[in-house]
Every structure is written in structure tokens, then in C-alpha cells.
Amino acid sequence: MTGEVKAAFVFMMAGTLSALLLAVFVMFSQESPEAAVLSGKKEKLKESLEMVKYESVSIYYAEEDRPILELTKETLRDAAVMNRELFASPLQDSVDLIFFSNRNDMESFSKLKDITGFYSNNMRMIGLLPEERTHLNSGEGFAVFLYKRVLVHEYTHYAFHVKLRELNADPAAYPLWFHEGVAEWASAHDAIEIRTLPSVVPLSKLKTDRQWQKARTGYETDIYLQSYYLIEELAEKKGRGVILDIIEETAERGSFADGFKAAVGQSLTGFEKEFKRKYEAKKTAWKVSSFRAVFIINE
């Protein structure tokens, strides 16, 4: 498909982090014949759904999704408050939020496989597949937690691109790990991440979609978690304002490496080396603690 595709994988379990896999994609592309076709499909899809406005978001839904409208509005409200502060933007650009009724419809529309949500910058839309509707409708904690996390992730991609338009900046100037890391961090920064990275993928191999897709299968690690931890590390070092600083400095200089150094006061290469040392040490500590736990249990 034309343009770049970004993916984020979230592993969560009610109250803890575990092995449940959830995939969400983000697309941004230039105008193309294929984009025009998708835009036409989007308008046709909207005609078949009901619509309700919430601030700058037009929510398109079928009757079966009416019970989750209040949860959706609540999540959008929280996401907007956080992202307005994060990006220093009123976030007034309109965006469509469209619920898909099943996986086949979503995959047919997006031409993407195994997804539960996506954001298209070209079409200015968020697509969501509310899984486990019965559990969502009943307010079950785990289902609600997952739904809110995915929606916040996608909304953050929308907010990021709004800011880039304000700055007249090219989204492709920012490496994929930064796009995904910011969205993952926004959706999970208030959670406690306790998972250890098996290994750290070089950032030079996480810039483009092609590299990202290759890294998914070429490394025995979680590149989505790595991107989250990279942003978390930056926020701990410099405060959450460093995210906007990097975005603005990169827009001004036209180079992510130059913008990063200006905002962080450290070269990207130096930060990467420091990050790798830290997480290699954490991995070693985790292995030692796991061995001791097993040894004690087996005594």
C-alpha cells in the first residue's frame, strides 16, 4: 500500500502486563490514486452509519456500538486534555472516528491484516474494531482498559500529525520508533511497565516502515516496547516537555538527529548507547532474580 505504515503492539492483562497481543496501525501517505479510492470508500461507509459529534471528532457508529459511545467520549476527552498539553496545540483539526463491525470489513477497507485499529493521516480518520463488545457494553474492566488504551494511542497519532501540520513539518522526518514511541507512551505512561527487553534493536534499523516490518521478524525482541521505553527514558531525563522540544527543534532544523541534540543536549548516538547499556543491565538483573526465585522454589 502507498505510504508508510506504523504498527504498535500492546501486551496487557487485567492489572498486569502479559501475553495478550493487540495490533493497531497508523498510515500516513501522500495523495495518490489509491488514496482517492480509499477516500471514496470512507464516504460510502459513513453514509451507512449514524454520527455524533464530540468536539473536533465525528464518531460514526452502528446501533450495536451505541452502548460504548459514552466510554468513547470519556476516553476522547481524557486523550484530548493530555495531548493538548503534550503538543501545546488546541487540536481543532477535524477527524473522523469510524467503528467497524467486524475484522473482515476493517481489513477490506484498510488493506491491512490482523488489526484492531488504525489512523490514516491522509483520510483524517481513526478506524476502530471494538472487540469483545459484550464485555465492553457491560463495563468489564479488562475490556475497557484495552479499548481506552488503543483509542488513546490512535488519538495521539492524530494529535502528533496536527502539530506537524502547524509546524509545516514532514512526518517522514521523524523516525518510526519516535512516532510509535510517543503514541505508546501517551497511552501507557501512567501504567507500570515491568517487562524486560530481550535485546535492543539499533535505532538506525527502526526509521522506516520497511525496516520496521523487517525488525518485527528479524529480532527476538519487542520493538514496540522498546520504542515506549525510549520515550519513557527521555521523559525521565528531561521531563515530558522534551517530546515537544524534539518535535519543534526537528521541524526547525530539518534533521531529527540535529533536533534531538538541540532538545536533549545529547547526541542521538550517545543516548542510544546509554539506553542500550541500561537495558542490558536490567536484562542481566532480571535473569539473576528469576534464577534465584526458581532456586528458592525448588529447595
Short names for language-model regions:
Residues 5, 65-68, 242:
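Single-residue recognition of alpha-helix capping/boundary positions
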Residues 3-9, 136-137, 178-187:
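N-terminal short leaders/motifs
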Residues 45-167, 256:
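Juxtacatalytic substrate-recognition/specificity segment
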Residues 1-51, 285-299:
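N-terminal low-structure segments adjacent to metalloprotease catalytic domains
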Residues 146, 150, 166-299:
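Acidic/His/Gly-enriched intrinsically disordered linker/tail segments
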Residues 7, 26-28, 59-60, 208-212, ...:
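A short alpha-helix capping/helix-coil boundary motif
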